[in-house]
Structures are given as structure tokens and as C-alpha cells.
């Protein structure tokens, strides 16, 4: 093996870095080096005239970025719970996520995973605690060894934006690399695996991480082409053209220009025998507008999001059941993404617990992620539904607190602790009854 194995691993990421830059240009055209985003930009055959360049720039828009935002903003991890009765401090388990600022940075992590097909989270020792560092696919080179579907890679290298290696991760050590490419510090983590978690929402059974942008590039190109055609009509053929036939030859170029100027500015036109005036109608845009809506609807359907989330159209006279049905595909899509992202997130927390010598937490596979409910429901609707669950089905009200929109599991736990510390008079009396040990109140002696 080479004395500098990270160099070969970094070289192998060059194509991935270029692809990531191309996806960024597809998300927000014009945000990176001109010419990178050729697949979406050449909607008119790559014309060079000023008018063509201007119309091309107007046609390109951040439609894919809006789509990724629509999905990414609805994926919020609020905490973890256990599905079995095990001992352990959930606050300590969740603390590395909080220390890394991930409650506010997680949306960027999920959006990077959706855009590039995968994003990464490094779990590293930081004194007595664990530290989490997120990185996009453009800044990480990974070797999966013989199993591309494994939870942990065989080794990994972290890069600068320019592609220079800065950190080499093995199953035992974190090796820091200076600007000359030489190692200068090694930190032993001793986990037995390279602590780099991969968040891949569309990971195939063979380990291929598909990108949402790559999946939707063709329908997005179709939509942009339709928008470009509409702009061409608006720019060139959206007004009536006046015509005149039978005019005498003016005789000179100056007279011809003078007559042309007169005809173009006069509101009342007159002519001699045989002169006929008319007009050519403007090109109708109805068909291209219908095509634009159809292309946007196709793009939304392929992304499993409601079409109105991309078009901004208003919803009129939709019942609650119809609205829920319209959003069912999006909800199923987000649920599948949450399932895919939940396992690597829990792996990161278990690795953090192992670094912090919390053996019980590190071996706890009963954990599950609490994902925030981001459905657009009013508080009155939620209260009515939860009240019916409690009264009609006998579900304890305290267990429904965390299902209230906007209430996190941590807040629900605080409510439970407060309720335990401040019982109602009836609950206090019931506790006094059971304090005797026989279920009867104590007898006062006279």
C-alpha cells in the first residue's frame, strides 16, 4: 500500500466533485462556473446571440432547488426514544447532535443528501466527548471495500473545496494532513470501523446512491424548454403586425424609410387605388401555457410532491379529506426518506456513545428517531382529533402530548415531569390511598 493512501482516494473523487458541481448549477442556474450546467442551460441549442442568451437566462430558474427545499424542510429530527424498557440517559445520547448544532444545520444535511444522493457525518473524538462534522459528497472520498451497502466504510478521506486532503479516517485512527500532503497528527478512536456515516435517501440494494436531481433532470429540462418557448412567443410574436400592400415604389431608400416611419406611427392610414391595409394576428400562447402546466405537473408527480407546491397555485374548495389524499404521495415519500436517514443517524449517536464510554447506549439497538410532524394542520383540528382518541379509544392523554403540532418529545417530557411533580387533588388523594400499602386510607386513632 502507498505511504499516502489518501492521495489515491482523493483522486478517485474528482468525477464525483464535478458531478456535484453540475447538480448545484442545475439547482440554481448561474450559481457556479458558467457552462457547468449544460444539461439544463442548452434549451435553445446553445445560441450565441444576445437575445438568445437573455431569453435563456430568463427561462432558467431554481425549480429543482424549490423541489429539494420542499422536501428537505419537512424532515426534522427532534430526538430519540427507546422501543424497549432499557436503562440509559436519552439526553446524553442526543447531546452530541445538539453540541454540533445539528438541530439548525440538519436541513442543510438532508438537502445535500437529496441533491447528491448521499451526504456524510464524521464522528470524531473531541477530548472526553464526541464531535459530529457534516460534509457533502464533494468533500468526502469513501472506500466501501467489498460491501458497498455497509453501514461504515473501510476508510475515508475528507477534502477541502479544492480537493486537497485534510483528514484520513481508518478503522482505528484519524490522521490529519497538512498542505504538503504529509500526516502531522494521529488521533486514535479505537472503534474498529471508520466512523463516517452515510445518509443516502435513495440507496439501492446494490449500494448505488441515486440523486434526486439526476432522477429529475430530464423532466426539468422539458419544463425549462417549454418556458423558453413561451418567452420566445412573448418576445417575438405576442402582438398584431400591421400589413400594407399595393404601395407605389418610393424610388429611393430615403423615401422608403420615410414612408415606413409614417406607416408605423400614424393612427389613421390612407392610400391610393389598390392599396390594402391589414394585420397578422399575434401567436396564441394558450397551448404553450397548457404545456407548461402539464410539464410542471409531471415534474411534481415524479418527485411525489403536490403540483401546487411548485406552481404557487391556490387551492379552492378542497375538503380536508381531499387535501389529505392530494398530499398522501408526498407523505409516503417523506416517510421513506425518514426511514432511510434514521439508521445512519442512530449509528452516529451509538458511535458517539462508544467514544464517550457509554457502553449501554453504544449497544442499544432499540432506539428510534422522533421525526417532527410537519403536516399543515390547525391546533383546533389536532386538539379535536387527539381528544377523540383519548375519549373514544381510551388512549392516555399524556401519551398524546407529543403528537400535538409543534410540540417536540422533549417538551412533552417536560410536561410529564411537571404533571408528576404537581398532581391534581384527585391524583394526590389516590396516591394517599395507596400509601398505606393496602389500598385503603390510614385509620386515625381517637
Region roles according to the model:
Residues 109-110, 124, 234-242, 309-314, ...:
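Short coil/turn segments at secondary-structure boundaries
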Residues 185-325:
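Extended, charged amphipathic alpha-helical segments
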Residues 235, 241, 327-346, 352, ...:
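Long, compositionally biased
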Residues 386-446:
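Activation/maturation switch segments at domain boundaries
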Amino acid at each position: 500500500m502507498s505511504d499516502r493512501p489518501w492521495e489515491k482516494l482523493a483522486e478517485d473523487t474528482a468525477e464525483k466533485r464535478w458531478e456535484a458541481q453540475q447538480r448545484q448549477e442545475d439547482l440554481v442556474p448561474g450559481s457556479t462556473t458558467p457552462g457547468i450546467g449544460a444539461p439544463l442551460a442548452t434549451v435553445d441549442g446553445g445560441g450565441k446571440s444576445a437575445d438568445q442568451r437573455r431569453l435563456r437566462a430568463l427561462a432558467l430558474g431554481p425549480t429543482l432547488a424549490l423541489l429539494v427545499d420542499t422536501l428537505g424542510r419537512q424532515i426534522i429530527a427532534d430526538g430519540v426514544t427507546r422501543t424497549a424498557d432499557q436503562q440509559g440517559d436519552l439526553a446524553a445520547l442526543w447531546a452530541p447532535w445538539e453540541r454540533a448544532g445539528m438541530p439548525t444545520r440538519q436541513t442543510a444535511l438532508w438537502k445535500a443528501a437529496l441533491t447528491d444522493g448521499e451526504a456524510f457525518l464524521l464522528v470524531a473524538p473531541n477530548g472526553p466527548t464526541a464531535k459530529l462534522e457534516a460534509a457533502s459528497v464533494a468533500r468526502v472520498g469513501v472506500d466501501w471495500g467489498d460491501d458497498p451497502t455497509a453501514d461504515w466504510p473501510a476508510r475515508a478521506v475528507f477534502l477541502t473545496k479544492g480537493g486537497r486532503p485534510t483528514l484520513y479516517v481508518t478503522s482505528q485512527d484519524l490522521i490529519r494532513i497538512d498542505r504538503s500532503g504529509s500526516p502531522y497528527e494521529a488521533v486514535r478512536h479505537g472503534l474498529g470501523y471508520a466512523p463516517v456515516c452515510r445518509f443516502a435517501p435513495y440507496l439501492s440494494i446494490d449500494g448505488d446512491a441515486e440523486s434526486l436531481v439526476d432522477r429529475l433532470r430530464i423532466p426539468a429540462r422539458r419544463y425549462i424548454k417549454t418556458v423558453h418557448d413561451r418567452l420566445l412567443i412573448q418576445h417575438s410574436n405576442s402582438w398584431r403586425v400591421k400589413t400594407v400592400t399595393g404601395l407605389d415604389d418610393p424610388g429611393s431608400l430615403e423615401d422608403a424609410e420615410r414612408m415606413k416611419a409614417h406607416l408605423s406611427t400614424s393612427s389613421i392610414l390612407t392610400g391610393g387605388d389598390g392599396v390594402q391595409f391589414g394585420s397578422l394576428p399575434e401567436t396564441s400562447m394558450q397551448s404553450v401555457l397548457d404545456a407548461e402546466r402539464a410539464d410542471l405537473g409531471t415534474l411534481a408527480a415524479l418527485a411525489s410532491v403536490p403540483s401546487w407546491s411548485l406552481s404557487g397555485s391556490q387551492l379552492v374548495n378542497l375538503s380536508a379529506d381531499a387535501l389529505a389524499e392530494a398530499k398522501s404521495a408526498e407523505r409516503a415519500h417523506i416517510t421513506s426518506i425518514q426511514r432511510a436517514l434514521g439508521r445512519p443517524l442512530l449509528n452516529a449517536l451509538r458511535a458517539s456513545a462508544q467514544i464517550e464510554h457509554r457502553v449501554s447506549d453504544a449497544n442499544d439497538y432499540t432506539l428510534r428517531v422522533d421525526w417532527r410532524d410537519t403536516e399543515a394542520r390547525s391546533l383546533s383540528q389536532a386538539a379535536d382529533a387527539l381528544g377523540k382518541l383519548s375519549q373514544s379509544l381510551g388512549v392516555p392523554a399524556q401519551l398524546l402530548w407529543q403528537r400535538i403540532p409543534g410540540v417536540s418529545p422533549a417538551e412533552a417530557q417536560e410536561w410529564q415531569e411537571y404533571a408528576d411533580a404537581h398532581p391534581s387533588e384527585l391524583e394526590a388523594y389516590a396516591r394517599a390511598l395507596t400509601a398505606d400499602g393496602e389500598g385503603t386510607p390510614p385509620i386515625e386513632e381517637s
